[in-house]
Amino acid sequence: EYHCATCDSQHNYNKSEVKGYRSVKKEDVDLFKKAKRQWESSPELHEYVPSEDIPEGHMTSVRNPIFDHGYEKWADMFNKRQLLSLSSLLYEIDKLDNQNSKEFLLLALTDCLRRNTMMIGYSQVANQVSDLFRTNAFDPPTRPTESNVWGAEYGTGTFKSTWEMIIRGVE
């Protein structure tokens, strides 16, 4: 996703008129492959990812059989880059001594999870990545959208934007 920097400074425009998307470039693919290699060579992070099977239930196997889409374990809902990013956050949070700090950071992380899985699509109406809980089911999107876990100048559901919201709430 990109924005027009000139328009951004004017603040008198419709964001959807200057917002756009570029095609995937080789550097994007290379970055993804690098993250995948890093994930695969970081076994210490794997303990922060649930290894359990997704249980069969009314919403997972009857109404919208998630298993028909290749999802068997909770970890299947994330790509390797997401697993690397999210488990790295958990790994660092886990090392903190201050319990209050840990809990605030975990609060930010859990909110960040809502928009950082392969179960997320793009909402054309809202002009942003959708939310995992947009429906009362796990309904895999036809075209998953990967958000930026860490944060960017624009974006919703990033760790940075959620953390800033928590800080404002605490202050």
Give a label for each model feature.
Residues 1-171:
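Nucleic-acid modification enzymes, centered on SAM-dependent nucleic-acid methyltransferases
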